[in-house]
Amino acid sequence: MSRTRTTPGRRVESDVVDIGEHEFESGEILPDLQVAYEAYGEFDGQNAVLVCHGLTGSQHVAGHGTESGVSGQARAWWGDIVGPGKALDTNDYYVICVNVPGSCYGTSGPASEGPDGEPWGTDFPPVTVHDWTRAQRRLLDHLGVGRLHAVVGGSVGGMNALDWAVQFPDDVERLAVVASAARLDSQCLGIDAVARRAITSDPNWNGGDYYGEDRASPDAGLGLARQLGHLMYLSKDSMERKFGRRSAGRGDRGDAFPSDPAAAFFPYREVESYLDYQAEKFAERFDANSYLYLTRAMDDFDLSEGYESDAAALAAFEGESLLVSFTGDWHFTTEQSESLAGAFRRVDAPVAHHVVESDHGHDAFLVEPEKVGPPLGDFVDEGVAGRAVTDTATDGGEPDEEKDFAPVHSSLFSR
């Protein structure tokens, strides 16, 4: 059901649209693809900005005062960036965020009802980032939105944004890729693989067939997967500052694995308590099969697939680009963003690589809006010439080969 709310300075659309038959990259066809979106502000024909959400994010990119019973990235996950008077100013722009296929916030995915009236489960077609982009394009067509003023994405949403520059290069004027990369490295691929195995090893997963009130969900496996994710999203420095080796005290929570009798002798540390809390909250809001589907889509993405190089993949894109990276992010490093900036430069595409000094790890793009907002807002308004936009290139327009991106942490597990 479509809902539109209008308050001073803010208009919000929230809807789920049936875009009809949709063929996935795998060749499988869904007869009726449902796509959930939210849009903020007024469309004037030229001011549309598409925001691509992160792995477990939703279309609820900004708050509108009516959310209840949701948490994490399901609820206003970038509310300090999107809204009236903010970096993506909804007084000026028509900001759209689309829940991607395979997710579980209204767009068709494994938990959605299939043709037989039962949830799809693992019979749902495999999804790729390319599938996300094409579904977004069809949703925008339905809304009457043609060329986009900007596409903005963080984390895997940045990969989604990059895919727009490849699949629909003429449809994007400005591209902002925040805390992302052209592909995952082998360490992140390995961590994602272990996270998926945590889910599929949970007896309650049952081959993906766990839906129904009379069945238990694989919450333990999904929780472990989320805990791995949180370790990947934080930096060593931020974890040490936040938790250290402090004991949380057992209280009523106990250990995550109470069957281990030796655990009673040892302290239950604050970092464990934090991870257990995050696991519990995540299992309440997210679907385990969706986590499998979306991590595979992220792992599969490679900007240069089908091309000789990243630069060749971007050759048709003539718009301006902003890359934002964070020095403490080892999930998507500053070096990866600099390599991507080099690909844009090799095809003479206007690009700025803005490096943010931060020790908050990958989560910095969510938790430090005061550092992300100014360059992002100025770029969307003014392009790479925006006042708050900096670049790693020298005055001559070439990258500074001597640039050090300290303090980069290559891994939480380095010695």
UniProtKB/Swiss-Prot annotation:
Annotated segments matching region Disordered: 387-415
Pathway noted in the entry: Amino-acid biosynthesis; L-methionine biosynthesis via de novo pathway; O-acetyl-L-homoserine from L-homoserine: step 1/1
Species the sequence originates in: Haloferax gibbonsii (strain ATCC 33959 / DSM 4427 / JCM 8863 / NBRC 102184 / NCIMB 2188 / Ma 2.38)
PANTHER family: HOMOSERINE O-ACETYLTRANSFERASE (PTHR32268:SF11)
Active site, UniProt feature: S155 (nucleophile), D329, H362
UniProt-annotated binding residues for substrate: R226, D363
Gene Ontology biological process: homoserine metabolic process; methionine biosynthetic process
Protein name: Homoserine O-acetyltransferase
Alphabetical keyword list: Acyltransferase, Amino-acid biosynthesis, Cytoplasm, Methionine biosynthesis, Transferase
Functional note: Transfers an acetyl group from acetyl-CoA to L-homoserine, forming acetyl-L-homoserine.
Enzyme class: transferase
Subunit structure: Homodimer.
Subcellular localization(s) per the UniProt record: Cytoplasm
EC number, UniProt record: 2.3.1.31
Gene Ontology CC terms: cytoplasm
Gene3D superfamilies: alpha/beta hydrolase
Membership in a protein family: Belongs to the AB hydrolase superfamily. MetX family.
UniProt-recorded Gene Ontology molecular function terms: homoserine O-acetyltransferase activity
Entry superkingdom: Archaea
